């Protein structure tokens, strides 16, 4: 099982073009971390460098595990939520990432395309909920957007917060 999951993690890491993905990527079940198996030894996630790698390898691990759970019909909930998985691509706090010229938009696109492809390849057995500042204009991306929480529209309506403060 771990070899299957590791093969998928390696493929996904290469799709995202993560640093170190030219090597074999795997989960270390003893230390509960992602590691890269290089010719000179193993490199744990804690030594992989950038925030893009940290977030990317977490994403890869979750997607590979969920794919395995679906493929093997394991009793694991068939959804996963990613909150701001593209945060590493935006140099500052942004309200609307569409206006950020410094973002690595191709890396953002690869991340969301991987999520889309995993769901499609599993024939809808997995639901991915993503909340993010990124808002790609690609048709395939916009078709997956349920709600843009901007300009006063929010996951938790303001009047709910007002009601709570009076309790």
Put a short name on every predicted segment.
Residues 1-41, 72-79, 91:
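Extended, charged coiled-coil "arm/hinge" scaffolds of SMC/Rad50-like chromosome-maintenance ATPases
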Residues 95-167:
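C-terminal lobe/lid and adjacent interdomain/linker elements of RecA-like ASCE P-loop ATPase modules
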């Amino acid at each position: 099982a771990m070899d299957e999951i590791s093969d998928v993690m390696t493929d996904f890491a290469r799709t995202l073009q993560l640093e170190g993905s030219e090597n074999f990527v795997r989960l270390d079940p003893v230390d509960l971390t992602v590691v890269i198996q290089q010719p000179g030894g193993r490199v744990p996630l804690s030594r992989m460098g950038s925030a893009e790698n940290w977030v990317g390898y977490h994403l890869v691990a979750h997607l590979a595990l969920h794919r395995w759970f679906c493929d093997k019909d394991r009793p694991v909930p068939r959804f996963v939520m990613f909150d701001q998985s593209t945060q590493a691509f935006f140099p500052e706090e942004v309200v609307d990432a569409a206006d950020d010229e410094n973002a690595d938009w191709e890396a953002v696109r690869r991340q969301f395309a991987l999520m889309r492809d995993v769901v499609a390849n599993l024939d809808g057995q997995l639901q991915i909920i993503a909340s993010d500042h990124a808002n790609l204009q690609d048709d395939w991306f916009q078709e997956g957007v349920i709600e843009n929480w901007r300009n006063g529209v929010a996951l938790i309506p303001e009047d709910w917060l007002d009601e709570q403060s009076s309790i």
